[in-house]
Amino acid sequence: MTENKTVLREASNVVTIEGTLAEVRHTEWKNGNGLNIELDIEVAPNEVHTVKGFSKYKKDDGTDNAVAKGYQTIVSEYKSIAKHGRDEADKVRITQGKISLNEYYSHGIFKSYPQLMANFVNRLDANEEFNPRAEFDVEVFVKNVTEEKVKGEETGRVNLNGYIPVYNGKVIPFTFVVTKEGSQYVENNYEKGTTVNVFGKIINYKEQKVTTKVAAFGEDKKEITSITRREYLITGGNDPYDEDSKNAFNADAIKKALTEREIYLDELKKEGNKENNKKSGFGGSAPNNKPSKPVEISDDDLPF
């Protein structure tokens, strides 16, 4: 049996972002051993992407961590719109970002949101070509393809639902939307259990429109409408990998990773309950001392 049948390799998962640095936020770890960073990068009017990162200051061997040093340089030297104004703000480029998930429990309710991670962010020189964009190129193990519906109406686009293998044999579920032009191909060719390589645009558009309602007497009324569009839009992709290809993800390895993910989520829920109990100064819920149920995954949740 070849290695790819027993070990779940990390998927190719590349995010490219180029834009103007809008804002930098960072926090030091409580133990003083590292930091978290968040960057807002503007790629178009009304379109800003938040990229996150975290790093220890030192590697295990005691030497300086280049990732943390890079973050410190961003905090101390990079110029943002928020602090220095649009004319002075740096143009930045990320070429090795990754799609990830921010997952947690809040008051017993599971929350899961897409997030973008990056270790290195480069400043562009004044003479470098500037091409603002936010794009992804990623391998996915297909769970299914479904019709996209908005308010119960089909849009003519489809959703590609699948799993992205990440580090240490883990997987994350992820949903992409496909352009109308590509939806029929995806629906006809991206079958359950296949491995595919797709690429496209990351869209995070938010605009507020102000309209005035003219009054017959008194003051006119201003009405604010928010327009928001967040999606990972597939604009192209390759034929599914042959099932015997060394690059095709193995269904049994995916199933094992999904079982381990359920265990992880159960532990995440317990941690969330602990935090909520700590915050309950009075009348908090009693601790749940019941033994955990065995992890069971429905056949409907499996991509094979």
From Swiss-Prot:
Residues 268-278 have a biased composition (Basic and acidic residues). It comes from the Bacteria. Residues 268-304 are annotated as: Disordered. This is SPbeta prophage-derived uncharacterized protein YorF. It comes from Bacillus subtilis (strain 168). The lineage of its organism: Bacteria, Bacillati, Bacillota, Bacilli, Bacillales. The gene is yorF.
